């Protein structure tokens, strides 16, 4: 029997995360018109998982599911040589272009903002290339201005939402002395002041109890952002762009989230080539696609991780939200696993790779038995034991 993990081995408790607690999270592509959103989405769509891999899901034309590349998964497949290989995926939604005044319904404003509310994170595409053939909605290329336009629209929509919430709470407080109503009202006032000060919700210093309430609101500025700076192929190849320093300075002043420079023109060219020709082109020009990096960064940004189940029949990534405990992780495989959870037998990927086999991991005392309070970590390799009424153990 594997040793039980001691309390000192447990990961330190984390503050709750802003956002939905689900293993089915998605990221949306956001930006002004003509910045490269749809081109980026079309490139990603070429890499998307065939619909038949999800027989019980209808994938909308503006949605794509793409494999998350991972050398650890590849290594496990080489080790076990399974009959079936199932990697993790990222769901990406293409969202219509925003225009100034969207919060008040301009353009496709209300639909646009409701689509952002439905996703869990944002790929914010910025135009950092000049092209007379591609018009800009504001008649000039200025990525920092574009950043401020979208930031303001999202904050204004959040202010509108929070003000409506305040109004509703005040009506309810007249009819009830419920302390929870008062707490929510105080929080809403703080959030409104925070937004009116030009700050996004995700950068607020919120208590755990605040976050639990905020997560019921699905505020637009609570969602994590990855900035994708779309430049010309020439600028991308020479790794130099006149707009990039100003973009970097702005992002550092506004939360310091991840910036990934890329080129839709280059990625589209590469996507249209046969794989061997694309590899040769990249080698000759000392350049590489950043689409894999974008996918992995987006996956992590919305707080998704995955654990592995591994054996000769199947190696599979089971994606879960960070901070998920073992019984809930087991439930992603089957509800019976969660309902009748006994324990999780856990190997760390690094231990398996270092030692070379499950038997060696067990011999080294690194094959652990974890209970209901164990928080699953990224790349854990897990075998669940469960027992349900009328059933047996797995």
Swiss-Prot record:
Cytoplasm as UniProt keyword: yes
InterPro entries: ATPase_YchF/OLA1 (IPR004396), Beta-grasp_dom_sf (IPR012675), G_OBG (IPR031167), GTP-bd (IPR006073), P-loop_NTPase (IPR027417), TGS (IPR004095), TGS-like (IPR012676), TGS-like_dom_sf (IPR023192)
Gene Ontology terms for molecular function: ATP binding; ATP hydrolysis activity; GTP binding; GTPase activity; metal ion binding; ribosomal large subunit binding
Keyword line: ATP-binding, Cell membrane, Cytoplasm, GTP-binding, Hydrolase, Magnesium, Membrane, Metal-binding, Nucleotide-binding
Gene3D superfamilies attached to this UniProt entry: 3.10.20.30, P-loop containing nucleotide triphosphate hydrolases, TGS-like domain
Activity regulation, per record: Activated by GAP1.
Domain OBG-type G: 25-282
Annotated signal sequence range: none
Compartments, record wording: Cytoplasm; Cell membrane; Cytoplasm, Cytosol
Disulfide bonds: none
GO cellular component: cytosol; plasma membrane
Residues holding Mg(2+): 38, 58
Main localization, broad class: cytoplasm
UniProt binding sites for GTP: 129, 263-265
Residue ranges constituting the TGS domain according to the UniProt record: 303-386
Binding site for ATP: 34-39, 56-60, 94-97, 230-231, 263-265
Gene Ontology biological process: negative regulation of defense response to bacterium; negative regulation of response to salt stress; response to salt stress
The UniProt record lists the keyword Heme: no
Cofactor dependence: Mg(2+)
CDD domains associated with the record: TGS_YchF_OLA1, YchF
Family: Belongs to the TRAFAC class OBG-HflX-like GTPase superfamily. OBG GTPase family. YchF/OLA1 subfamily.
Subunit structure: Monomer (Potential). Interacts with GAP1.
Role this protein plays: Hydrolyzes ATP, and can also hydrolyze GTP with lower efficiency. Has lower affinity for GTP (Potential). Exhibits GTPase activity. Exhibits similar binding affinities and hydrolytic activities toward both GTP and ATP. Binds to the 26 S ribosomal RNA in vitro, but not to the 5.8 S or 18 S rRNA. Confers sensitivity to salinity stress by suppressing the anti-oxidation enzymatic activities and increasing lipid peroxidation thus leading to the accumulation of reactive oxygen species (ROS).
Protein name per Swiss-Prot or TrEMBL: Obg-like ATPase 1
Native source organism of the sequence: Oryza sativa subsp. indica (Rice)
High-level lineage: Eukaryota, Viridiplantae, Streptophyta, Embryophyta, Tracheophyta
């Amino acid at each position: 029997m594997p040793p039980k993990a001691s309390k000192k081995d447990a990961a330190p408790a984390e503050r709750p995360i802003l956002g939905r607690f689900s293993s089915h999270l998605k990221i949306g592509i956001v930006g002004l018109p003509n910045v490269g959103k749809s081109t980026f989405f079309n490139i990603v769509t070429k890499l998307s998982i065939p619909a038949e891999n999800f027989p019980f899901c209808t994938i909308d034309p503006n949605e794509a599911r793409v494999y998350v590349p991972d050398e650890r998964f590849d290594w496990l497949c080489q080790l076990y040589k399974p009959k079936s290989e199932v990697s993790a995926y990222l769901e990406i939604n293409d969202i219509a272009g925003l225009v100034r005044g969207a919060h008040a319904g301009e353009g496709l404003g209300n639909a646009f903002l409701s689509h952002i509310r439905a996703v869990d994170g944002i790929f914010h595409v910025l135009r950092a290339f000049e092209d007379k053939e591609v018009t800009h909605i504001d008649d000039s290329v200025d990525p920092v201005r574009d950043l401020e336009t979208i930031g303001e629209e999202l904050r204004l929509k959040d202010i509108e939402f929070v003000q409506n919430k305040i109004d509703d709470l005040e009506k309810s407080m007249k009819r009830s002395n419920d302390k929870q109503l008062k707490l929510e009202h105080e929080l809403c006032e703080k959030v409104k002041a925070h937004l009116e000060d030009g700050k996004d919700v995700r950068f607020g210093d919120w208590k755990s109890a605040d976050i639990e309430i905020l997560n019921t609101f699905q505020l637009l500025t609570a969602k994590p952002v990855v900035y994708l700076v779309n430049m010309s192929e020439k600028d991308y190849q020479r790794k130099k762009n006149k707009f990039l320093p100003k973009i970097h300075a702005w992002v550092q002043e506004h939360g310091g989230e991840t910036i990934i420079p890329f080129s839709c023109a280059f990625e589209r060219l590469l996507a249209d080539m046969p794989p061997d020709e694309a590899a040769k082109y990249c080698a000759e020009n000392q350049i590489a696609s950043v689409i894999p990096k974008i996918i992995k960064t987006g996956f992590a940004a919305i707080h998704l991780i995955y654990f592995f189940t591994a054996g000769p029949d199947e190696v599979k990534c089971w994606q879960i939200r960070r901070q998920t405990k073992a019984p809930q992780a087991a439930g992603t495989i089957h509800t019976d696993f969660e309902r009748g959870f006994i324990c999780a037998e856990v190997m760390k990927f690094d231990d398996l790779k270092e030692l070379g086999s499950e038997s060696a991991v067990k011999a080294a005392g690194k094959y652990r038995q974890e209970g209901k309070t164990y928080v699953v970590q990224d790349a854990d390799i897990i075998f669940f034991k469960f027992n349900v009424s009328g059933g047996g153990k797995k």
